[in-house]
């Protein structure tokens, strides 16, 4: 069963997604990042090129011929055929249709109240379906 991890109070979703992608790549996991829009997907694509001066995180947009062998795939379309099913990083305000295909889902919730309200709805929906949930609040130890 898919494990769902909620990460809340995140000041910058793109930077946080880059950190998760970097950590996943370091542990040899394969990641799909679901962006809210094409613009956000393109911004994440650009941000991953600049994570650090010493790290390179191989990534492509979904649909790229290299997607099956690339550890990080970015998309704004949850209905596209995806090559990986280890981890899904959800940057959207909705429950992805395909979340159960993944071993693990990271729900990234910003400081924005509307984003937090939608995140709470998703948390309740996952809980009603008996998915294992964890909750990490940024800034708390």
Task: Briefly describe each language-model feature range.
Residues 97, 115-123:
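Helix-rich interaction surfaces within compact, conserved domain-sized segments
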Residues 104-113:
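Trafficking entry modules
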Residues 2-100, 111, 129-132, 136-141:
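Positively charged, polar, low-complexity stretches
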Residues 47-49, 102-105, 121-122:
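Short, glycine/charged-enriched secondary-structure capping and boundary segments
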């Amino acid at each position: 069963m898919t494990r769902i991890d909620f990460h809340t109070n995140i000041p910058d979703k793109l930077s946080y997604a880059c950190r998760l992608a970097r950590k996943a790549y370091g542990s040899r996991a394969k990641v799909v990042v679901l962006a809210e829009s094409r613009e956000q997907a393109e911004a994440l694509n650009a941000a991953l090129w600049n994570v650090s001066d010493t790290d390179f995180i191989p990534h492509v947009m979904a649909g790229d011929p290299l997607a099956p062998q690339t550890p990080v795939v970015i998309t704004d379309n949850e209905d596209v055929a995806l090559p990986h099913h280890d981890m899904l990083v959800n940057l959207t305000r909705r429950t992805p249709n395909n979340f159960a295909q993944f071993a693990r889902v990271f729900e990234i919730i910003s400081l924005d109240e509307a984003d937090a309200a939608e995140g709470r709805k998703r948390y309740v929906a996952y809980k009603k379906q008996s998915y294992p949930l964890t909750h990490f609040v940024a800034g708390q130890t």
